[in-house]
Each structure stands twice: as structure tokens, then as C-alpha cells.
């Protein structure tokens, strides 16, 4: 393959994930849609939660302190890899960039993520109160929907899902260092729980991140019900 052909092929690969702003899967449109879905699930009520998606060399992030179910495409911030805002929201509203931004970039820098999602799910908060340093569960079918961050392969039915827990802080940005340290200690995990607060989940693509957060929240809700019934989260006698 000559140099020109190689460069052309490389450019096509780099552009393959970039779609026009009118496309429903462009982050300007996708982030508001996902925020509405998360709001309906109770994961982003009261202006809580956050969503960030990478496309090309840009990072798209929802604003902070707004009604997440009412975010519009022209209200999204665009950042570069240095966390500099390269495009302000195209609105007259005085919007503030998400407090989650440095935590999103933990996932981008340390995991090469394509998306990072932050929820304030009640299931996450309850699990963080029931567990000490980790949430662990095995032998549940929905575990198969979660990717091992190191091997990039899906977990199996008999595998144990392990999600670490860090302590909450008064300000979101102050979680940055403890989240990064936790990610170093748990290289296989695609999520971090914040006690009495919520959860961060990331993956290579927004589709995988969305699937992971849905599976994890399901498993946490199930675990809470299992606890009330006296059922073990890591049973030893399952065939």
C-alpha cells in the first residue's frame, strides 16, 4: 500500500464515526435524547446526572444545573482533549459546563472511553449504603451485558461483577483524584460507585456505555430485592 493510499484509508477510518449535526446520533442530538430517557428512569431528576460523548477529536458534554429532560441540542458544550471549551452552547442562556467534566475525562484519558455516563439512580445510592468497598454479584444472566474493561470481552454468567465504591465529597470535582485512584486499582471495572451519590459508567462507545449502565442498574435493583429475601449475591451452590 503506497503512502497516499494509506493516508486516505486512515482518514476514512478516522471519519467513520463522525456524523453531521443533523444526524440523530450526533452528540448534539443524542445527549438530549439520552438525558430524557435517563430522567424518565429516575436517573437524572432534579438536574442531577450527566452525559458526555466523544466524537472525532471533540468531547460533547451536557450543561450543569439544568432540567436534564429539557436540554436542547444547542445547549451542549464542546471541549478538546485538554478540557478547553472549543465551542460554547449556541444559546443566549447563561449555561455552566458540567461539574462532572474532570471525572468524565478520567474515563477518556485512563480508559480511552468513547462515552461516560453519570446517574443518580436510587438503586446505586442504596447499594452504596449496603456495601463497604465493593458491590459484588454473580450467577445472574444480565451480567453478560457488561464488558471486562481489560479483556474487552463480555462477562459470563458465572463471573463475578465487581464495582468499587468511593466516598462522596462536597463538590463533584473533588472526586476526580479518588476516582482515578480507584480506576487504577480496578482495571477490569467499567464503573465506579460514589457513596450516597450515584455512579459513573464508561465504555468504548455510547451504545456500550448505555447498555452497561442499564445492566448494572438492573443488577443493583435485583440485589436490593434479593437482600430482603435473604438470597446471596455470590451463591456458592449454583450448578
Swiss-Prot record:
Top-level EC class as recorded in UniProt: lyase
Stored Gene3D superfamilies: Class II aldolase/adducin N-terminal domain
EC number annotated for this UniProt entry: 4.2.1.109
This protein's pathway: Amino-acid biosynthesis; L-methionine biosynthesis via salvage pathway; L-methionine from S-methyl-5-thio-alpha-D-ribose 1-phosphate: step 2/6
Alphabetized UniProt keyword annotations: Amino-acid biosynthesis, Cytoplasm, Lyase, Metal-binding, Methionine biosynthesis, Zinc
Any GO molecular function: methylthioribulose 1-phosphate dehydratase activity
Record: active site: 141
Gene Ontology annotations of biological process type: L-methionine salvage from methylthioadenosine
Cofactor comment text: Binds 1 zinc ion per subunit.
InterPro entries reported for this sequence: Aldolase_II/adducin_N (IPR001303), Aldolase_II/adducin_N_sf (IPR036409), MethylthioRu-1-P_deHdtase_MtnB (IPR017714), Salvage_MtnB_euk (IPR027514)
Residues holding Zn(2+): 118, 120, 197
UniProt-recorded name of the protein: Probable methylthioribulose-1-phosphate dehydratase
Species, as recorded: Leishmania major
